[in-house]
């Protein structure tokens, strides 16, 4: 068989043979086999050209996808599958990309953690879940997370949360809110407890009284439409306790309010 034409088509080339067979090949394929118009190829060489072209095309697709940002092995595999790359050659493409360090899940984890430390607000548990969803092995994630002390980040987040809620919640509710927020963000209980203790939050009696009377008035307006006397009083007490107010403070406020 003779090559009758090689023509560029966007990112690929068409290779035409005198037996009317047409192939899509990459530039790497042309270079690798030193293909040119008029070259004679036998069936074995043609099969090798086809296989190499598939691998080369798949690798180029992977490199194109990676060029926008760092990707995990799982993400690249999914991308190749979405672009109809033969599943039999995907492992070979991935191995090639990994051998050239285009895909490196360990480096991905390190970059992901560092970015979170610099600009994020997530603790190790949430980070691990996000990375597991990207197909990274648990062993790789845990190895990198264990090397990081998340207390400084937790401290920074707790200070931001404290400033946000310090004039809106009573002391107990404030501490509970900080603890809930930190653990929801993926920090473990011990780190969360330590950084909250380090804030040295003290009770502001004047603020507490102002907050409790505002909440008491709100609950009274809401509940007095349905209940009266003893039941109204008990429901107000329960509502305020759920908001983090102390029982004795509630009783004291009620004596003056009702």
Swiss-Prot record:
Keywords: Cytoplasm. It is found in: Cytoplasm. GO terms for biological process: regulation of DNA repair. InterPro entries: RecX_HTH_1st, RecX_HTH_2nd, RecX_HTH_3rd, Regulatory_RecX, WH-like_DNA-bd_sf. Belongs to the RecX family. Modulates RecA activity. This is Regulatory protein RecX. It comes from Streptococcus agalactiae serotype III (strain NEM316). The gene is recX.
């Amino acid at each position: 068989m003779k090559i009758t034409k090689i023509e560029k088509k966007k990112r690929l080339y068409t290779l035409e043979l005198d037996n009317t067979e047409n192939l899509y090949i990459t530039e790497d394929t042309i270079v690798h086999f030193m293909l040119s118009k008029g070259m004679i190829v036998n069936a074995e060489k043609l099969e090798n050209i086809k296989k190499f072209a598939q691998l080369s095309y798949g690798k180029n697709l992977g490199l194109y996808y990676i060029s926008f940002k760092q990707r995990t092995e799982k993400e690249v595999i999914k991308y190749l599958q979405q672009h109809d790359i033969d599943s039999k050659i995907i492992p070979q493409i991935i191995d090639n990309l990994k051998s050239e360090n285009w895909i490196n899940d360990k480096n991905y984890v390190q970059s992901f953690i560092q970015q979170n430390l610099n600009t994020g607000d997530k603790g190790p548990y949430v980070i691990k879940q996000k990375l597991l969803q990207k197909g990274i092995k648990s062993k790789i994630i845990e190895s990198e997370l264990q090397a990081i002390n998340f207390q400084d980040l937790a401290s920074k987040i707790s200070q931001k949360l404290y400033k946000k809620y310090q004039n809106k919640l009573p002391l107990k509710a404030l501490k509970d809110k900080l603890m809930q927020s930190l653990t929801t963000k993926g920090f473990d209980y011990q780190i969360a407890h330590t950084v909250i203790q380090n804030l040295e939050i003290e009770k502001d009696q004047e603020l507490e009284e102002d907050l409790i009377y505002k909440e008491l008035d709100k609950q009274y307006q809401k509940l007095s439409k349905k209940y009266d006397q003893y039941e109204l009083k008990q429901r107000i007490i329960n509502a305020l306790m759920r908001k983090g107010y102390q029982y004795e403070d509630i009783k004291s406020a009620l004596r003056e309010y009702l």
